[in-house]
């Protein structure tokens, strides 16, 4: 699932991707990287992330993104890499508490 929307720089919104089956996904890195005009996301909080090991650069440089669905409910137990996950994002973005204090920018 990595890099699906990477560099879609004119993408403003997405269709409903909330019901995507992510049960066996292990990599979500660079998923929305460089989607500079993306200003909202569907409710991706329903995604099953229990097998995901890499979320690096997932929302990197999503400069117009002003809010996230409640991804604090995701399962991060197997996550090994999350470097720069929110790098270049608005400092007003509602970052989940799991990432507060981490080097993620």
Which residue stretches match the model-derived regions?
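Negatively charged
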Residues: 1-105
């Amino acid at each position: 699932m990595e890099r699906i929307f990477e560099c879609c720089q004119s993408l403003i919104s997405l269709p409903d991707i909330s019901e995507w089956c992510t049960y066996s996904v292990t990599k979500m890195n660079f998923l929305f990287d460089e989607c500079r005009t993306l200003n909202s996301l569907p409710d991706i909080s329903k995604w099953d992330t229990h097998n995901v090991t890499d979320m690096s650069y997932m929302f990197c440089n999503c400069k117009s993104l002003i809010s996230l669905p409640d991804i604090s409910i995701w399962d991060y137990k197997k996550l090994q890499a999350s470097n720069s996950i929110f790098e270049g994002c608005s400092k007003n973005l509602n970052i989940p508490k799991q990432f507060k204090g981490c080097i993620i920018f």
